[in-house]
Amino acid sequence: MGITVLKNEGLDFHARISTPLSEIDDDIQKELLDLTKKVKIAGFRAGKVPVSIVKKKYGTSVRNDIIERRINHSVNHVIKEHNLNIIGRPKIEELQNEPDKALEFTVKIELLPKITIPDLKKISLDRPKLEVNSKDVEEQLEKLAALTKSYTKESKAKIKDGVQVTIDAIGYIKDEAFEGGKLNDFKVVIGSNALIPGFEKQLIGSKTGSEVDVNVTFPENYHAKDLAGKDARFAVQIKSVHTAEPTVIDEEFAKKFQSNSLEELRTHFAKQIENESEEAINTIMKMNLFDKLEKLLDFDVPESLLEQEKNILKSETDKNDQDESLLKDKSPKEITEYYNKLALRRVRIGLLLAEYAKSKNLQLEPDDLRKVIMQQARNFPGQENMIFDFYKNNPRAIEGLKGPALEDKAVQYIFNNEIKLKEKKYTKEELEKYLEAEEQRITLI
């Protein structure tokens, strides 16, 4: 076997490999002789089939198998001999495979970069810490009390904020009833903003038995695209009005929600408020870490990984509403630059974290995968069980989660053992503003 290195620069390794015709013919002959002992052909005793007959029947397929084996063996030999850290499958080009000539081909191999892990202990980040106060907890208790009100007392008085109204309604656009615009025995609490903006307000002052024309404009971002931004009129009949007695937040109230005391329910809500912000904080902390890492990384990345990541980005953009896309007003050049920069960032950081996990011998545990599946499920409120069943019944889908799960584990290890974290305290209101601003920023990356 002859090997001529054509290129060994950066992340590209190209070589021309040749195998003498005599070696190919010897391999074929050995395979054919072996087959004479195994094949059964009518007219010949088992193990006594002439080589010429076997060659005539199986010669082409035997040769193809030998060529494939020789190519694989040669490529593996080159990889081992040159100690190549490859990514993806080697490409075979310029194949010379005539029966009367030596086997020759060019192999093109893409390499993983040599990654030097930066000194992560030099990185410092602020970590938001929510300080839950009594006002936050009382607001949650009041919301719970409002949600659990029982509207049992019928009222003949005029409709006002806080009452529950039962209505029938038919929606019209330009005097034509539209699909999905009919409501029957629909209950709504006035002031809850459960209906289109402006709808509930126009019912105030009416009474049971009244017929009211409600004029509204569907929001531009309304889920039904054929209605978004359009003016509509609803012919509404008020069927009944009910009020509720104020809910008293006391020990008995707490017991309705599996709490032994009101103080225990308050503690539960305080913890819940903290937990609700934790996932958003972790996501933003991860992006802030990546911002720091991006500035420290300058190694070349494999072109195939870069193209793969750009295709993923384009696919994500295509799935999103084009009217809301960050790229909707960008020129083709600007869009290309955006994809190139973001793909490079993602690939570099992904390779670094994989190398870091390897250096620390981080291994995935069942709990790590469960966490990632839970994160996936939270993206589909109301369909969590469907997501759990999907992963339970699709082992291949689980395989696709192992990369993100190991990345998350590496990030958490870095937070716990490497970088300096400085706790920064926020009230609930302050944290909400901070998270909103940060979420808008990270949509760009």
UniProtKB/Swiss-Prot annotation:
Domain annotation PPIase FKBP-type: ranges: 162-247
UniProt keyword Chaperone, yes or no: yes
InterPro entries: PPIase_dom_sf (IPR046357), PPIase_FKBP_dom (IPR001179), Trig_fac (IPR005215), Trigger_fac_C (IPR008880), Trigger_fac_C_sf (IPR037041), Trigger_fac_ribosome-bd_bac (IPR008881), Trigger_fac_ribosome-bd_sf (IPR036611), Trigger_fact/SurA_dom_sf (IPR027304)
Keywords of this entry: Cell cycle, Cell division, Chaperone, Cytoplasm, Isomerase, Rotamase
SUPFAM superfamilies the UniProt entry points to: FKBP-like, Triger factor/SurA peptide-binding domain-like, Trigger factor ribosome-binding domain
GO CC, one annotated term: cytoplasm
Catalytic function, reaction form: [protein]-peptidylproline (omega=180) = [protein]-peptidylproline (omega=0)
GO BP annotation list: 'de novo' cotranslational protein folding; cell division; chaperone-mediated protein folding; protein transport; protein unfolding
EC supergroup of this enzyme: isomerase
One example GO MF annotation: ribosome binding
Keyword flag Cell cycle: yes
Subcellular location: Cytoplasm
Main location: cytoplasm
EC number, UniProt record: 5.2.1.8
PANTHER family: TRIGGER FACTOR CHAPERONE AND PEPTIDYL-PROLYL CIS/TRANS ISOMERASE, TRIGGER FACTOR-LIKE PROTEIN TIG, CHLOROPLASTIC
HAMAP family: Trigger_factor_Tig
Similarity remark: Belongs to the FKBP-type PPIase family. Tig subfamily.
Recorded domain comment: Consists of 3 domains; the N-terminus binds the ribosome, the middle domain has PPIase activity, while the C-terminus has intrinsic chaperone activity on its own.
Function: Involved in protein export. Acts as a chaperone by maintaining the newly synthesized protein in an open conformation. Functions as a peptidyl-prolyl cis-trans isomerase.
Protein name (record): Trigger factor
Taxonomic path: Bacteria, Pseudomonadati, Pseudomonadota, Alphaproteobacteria, Rickettsiales
